[in-house]
Amino acid sequence: MMTPPPPPRIGIVVCDDSSVIRGLFTSILEDEPDFEVRASLHNGEMALRTLEHARPEHPVDVILLDIEMPVMDGLTALPHLLAIDPTVQVIVASAISEAHGRSSFKAIHLGAKDFIPKPRNMRDPDSVAAFRQQLVARVRALAHSRRRALGMPYPEGRAESAPVPAPALPRVQTAPALRPRPLGCPQALAIGCSTGGPQALLALLKALPREPRLPIFVTQHMPPTFTQIFADQISKSTFWPCIEATEGMSVTGGQVYLAPGDWHMLVRSSPNGPQIHVSQDPQENFCRPAVDPMLRSLAAVYGRGLLTVILTGMGSDGEKGCRVVVEASGAVIAQDEATSVVWGMPGAVARSGVCSAILPLPEIAPTLVRLLRGGAA
């Protein structure tokens, strides 16, 4: 019997008008045995032509797209790229600034799956190493997600190249066991998310009527500057006012508290009620902010009154924290695989057996409404 040929390597197009950035990205990506940079381009028009001529035996799985480029910029090219191939996974690479942050969120609205800030100092080995870890993990997670959705095999990368936890888990074969939903109306809602999270979180909050008694705590893996922009976007786009959390802030109902970039967000009891504490303790799950420390602190304050939702994201951040939530008699809901951009975080939680429900994204808000009205999940 003939051995089947190995699956084609993950195909990547790098599109940036800076030759220095293209060189950095290409050197990082080509160092991975399961990656192949199909093209290194300097404007969006070239990316369109490259994608139009892609062949099945040499697929383009991921495009790394700059925003500001001559001839055709990234925001102009993005909808045309997705019209050519709706399955291609676009990651926007941008500088860390307010203007670039707003453009990155616009790209997410147009269909990009994720964004990644370019390294601040390309001469700093630590900065480049941290960027490498994030870039490789995101490219691999999104490429694997694309190929699974298309029923295509994908090559396995070397384990040591991705120090973050496995970005995505194998497709579920049997339904994970579910726990009974604890009785009682939730007193606080915690949400954790990563890759694909901005779109999912906005969709959830747009569908969830504001509840004046309910505070919502969100940890989304996101760099500084971007979190403030995202908080503004949540406030403008949903029923819920959102604020980037700061030290000592008193918790009130009807408000969304977003973990600030590069800080863990915790909640502590005080004589005047729950208060926000932000911390630069070490990263957890290679992340800061991380979901696990937020959940541990919330479980200690709210106990059985805490309801947790884990949305799309790579890695397994939130799994350990959800175990603490359940031990404190709280409840956990995970987004299902079919509607997740990357079923890493929710998949890890689902497989751990702590969920009371595993739901498609459109069903999460109606379920929360029923729970807030005293019904069953």
Predicted regions span which residues?
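Conserved acid/base catalytic micro-environments in cytosolic active-site loops
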Residues: 2-14, 18-34, 45-46, 50-53, ...
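Short beta-strand elements in bilobed, periplasmic/extracellular small-molecule ligand-binding domains
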Residues: 36-38
